[in-house]
Amino acid sequence: MASHKITLLTGDGIGPEISIVAKKILAALSEKHSITFTIEEKPFGGQAIELTGKPLPEDTLNSCKASDAVLLAAIGDPKYDDLPRDLRPETGLLNLRAGLNLFANIRPIKIRQALISSSSLKSEIIKDVDLVVVRELTGGIYFGQPKGRISTEEAGERAFNTMTYSDYEIDRIAKIAFDLSETRRKKICSIDKANVLEVSQLWRERVIKAQEQYPNIELTHQYVDNAAMQLVREPAQFDVILTSNLFGDIISDEAAMLTGSIGMLPSASLGEDGPGVFEPVHGSAPDIAHKNLANPIAMILSTAMMLRTGLMEYKAATDLENAIDKVLGKGFRTIDLNRDQSNTKLGCREMGDQIIKAINGI
């Protein structure tokens, strides 16, 4: 019997609610597929601030390092916005990524056939969308030095940031994208701004160099402004999108809305070795917390992504994804997906229960 240790970070807002659903689903898959999941819950984000004064306690980080995978629900709350930056929940997430040496964010965007009408775009535009955004996570303008603010008599207040990438940083994220592309349609679109930015010129050079090791992969390039337009005009043209931290932050959120709800989207943050962090794209949604209104499907799909990418439990992952499609195909919806009120509306717990029934063939 396969055995895996998972650190579960339930976090803030709707995090505990969707975590309960994820644990029940793992229990169902454990029984069906003879897999042992040892789940260790640890405080993180605002939850950890309340308990320890820190968003990422050392004990939590150590548990994550000792795990096979980390499953994160959601963090953040406006009540922490006035704290010093290093004590906010979001800084805890940055420190977790740094502590686990995670540099690649993988965000799949797939249109589930039962939800085509939920998208704000026409069905003929989005019906075949199945793409993945591979975003570099630890370099670029968010981390470049120098950065800061200064006051001058001539110009008044002045702020500055530095966008910088090295060969090594580009090469390793490119390898992630090319390896992923080999398991898909063998197409990569690298997004940059090489017409005006030196850092993007280096990015393009290194990505072209990386392709030499993958002659069967079709590589194209788009400037980020054009790519933003193409994602809305013809999103099905994309297979794997490779891009830098800043551009990926923007492009991945735009791509997220192709599905009609951010409550449907999983993601993974990966390094070269060690455990990855698997989490929904959505935030902690404190306005609907504790009301049984949250859509747990992004958390459930993150669990499936963890099973496939982090734990190599391919059959269990496919089983879970098929169960989700089966439930959606029956017309069950959480409130964020029930726009036309023609489907059966479920709460967070009830949606989880229906997916467990589908796993068990009911």
Swiss-Prot record:
PROSITE patterns found in the cross-reference section: IDH_IMDH
Pathway(s) this gene product operates in, as recorded in its UniProt entry: Amino-acid biosynthesis; L-leucine biosynthesis; L-leucine from 3-methyl-2-oxobutanoate: step 3/4
InterPro entries, alphabetized: IsoCit/isopropylmalate_DH_CS, IsoPropMal-DH-like_dom, Isopropylmalate_DH
Site positions (Important for catalysis): 142, 193
Catalytic reactions on record: (2R,3S)-3-isopropylmalate + NAD(+) = 4-methyl-2-oxopentanoate + CO2 + NADH
Broad enzyme group: oxidoreductase
EC number: 1.1.1.85
Main location: cytoplasm
Function: Catalyzes the oxidation of 3-carboxy-2-hydroxy-4-methylpentanoate (3-isopropylmalate) to 3-carboxy-4-methyl-2-oxopentanoate. The product decarboxylates to 4-methyl-2 oxopentanoate.
Assembly with partners or alone: Homodimer.
UniProt family annotation: Belongs to the isocitrate and isopropylmalate dehydrogenases family. LeuB type 1 subfamily.
Protein name: 3-isopropylmalate dehydrogenase
Organism encoding this protein: Prochlorococcus marinus (strain SARG / CCMP1375 / SS120)
